Amino acid sequence: MGTVLSLSPASSAKGRRPGGLPEEKKKAPPAGDEALGGYGAPPVGKGGKGESRLKRPSVLISALTWKRLVAASAKKKKGSKKVTPKPASTGPDPLVQQRNRENLLRKGRDPPDGGGTAKPLAVPVPTVPAAAATCEPPSGGSAAAQPPGSGGGKPPPPPPPAPQVAPPVPGGSPRRVIVQASTGELLRCLGDFVCRRCYRLKELSPGELVGWFRGVDRSLLLQGWQDQAFITPANLVFVYLLCRESLRGDELASAAELQAAFLTCLYLAYSYMGNEISYPLKPFLVEPDKERFWQRCLRLIQRLSPQMLRLNADPHFFTQVFQDLKNEGEAAASGGGPPSGGAPAASSAARDSCAAGTKHWTMNLDR
């Protein structure tokens, strides 16, 4: 690099003073500046140009110095970052403990320097189970022919006894009972039973008894005392229980007495099994004296209240009474029917069965 100095007449003219005298010669630079090649003191121009030329190198030098400082600080930071060791655990190292145990075992096995024999280590001997000792001997051997106790090994243990199954106790398991009957069939069975019980009434027929029953039920429906018919299989079983326990054939000498006793049973059945709270007395009363009617009701209540309550609470007892009612019709069919009026009874039973429809009532209970 070098400095080029150009001279022109204008510059020389400008450099002259007004008096025509030339400007003073510039002072020579010092020896140090010459050694630097003339860069030590740059020429001073108009308007302070020399000062700006002096400032530019200083800016460059400061930038280079800043870069060097930044690089040096970065190196120091990298050098200061060291891996921190893990804190030592409070307990001993398991690997060290294992090595120590191995060394102790080796020292115990090796004989000491002064001589002597090391004691053998105790080794557990496996025990053979009894089942494994009774395996088959090899072919050609005579171990199988040895009797027990001759040194051939212990005999195999006897097999455990088989559990004995107790024989079924008769009557212990419940017996399934299936009873199926329709409303018309049960009405006919009830009529047959009353006709056989009242043997003194020769002109009585099952249809007449069924007519009394249907007349009371129809009257209560027409008067508005009940919304649905009372004649159902369950209610017929209840009426049969009352008639069986209250009607006495030797005490009933006329059809009027039988009708009064039968309507008393119906009144109690309606009171116990009916859907209404109370029923009128007029459809059930056929005699002028009401006292006799109430006396019969009280006697039946005192005698049969436990059985009536049991019939509603115990399904097995109900099934038994239901089966007894059905057997009454079978007994009448096998015995030839009532003593008199067999043909009218059969025709009335057929009409009742047709009126009741083909629906059957089935019970399936275990007893």
Swiss-Prot record:
Q: How does this protein lie in the membrane?
A: Lipid-anchor
Which residues are the lipid attachment points (N-myristoyl glycine)?
A: 2
Q: In which tissues is it expressed?
A: Brain and neuron specific.
Q: Which residues carry this modification: Phosphothreonine?
A: 84
Q: Annotated Gene Ontology MF terms? A: actin binding; cyclin-dependent protein serine/threonine kinase activator activity; lipid binding; protein kinase binding
Give the source's domain of life in one word.
Eukaryota
Its GO biological process annotations read: axon guidance; brain development; cerebellum development; hippocampus development; layer formation in cerebral cortex; neuron migration; positive regulation of calcium ion-dependent exocytosis; regulation of cyclin-dependent protein serine/threonine kinase activity
Which SUPFAM superfamilies is this protein grouped with? Answer: Cyclin-like
Q: What is this protein called?
A: Cyclin-dependent kinase 5 activator 2
Q: What is the lineage of its organism?
A: Eukaryota, Metazoa, Chordata, Craniata, Vertebrata
Gene (name only): CDK5R2
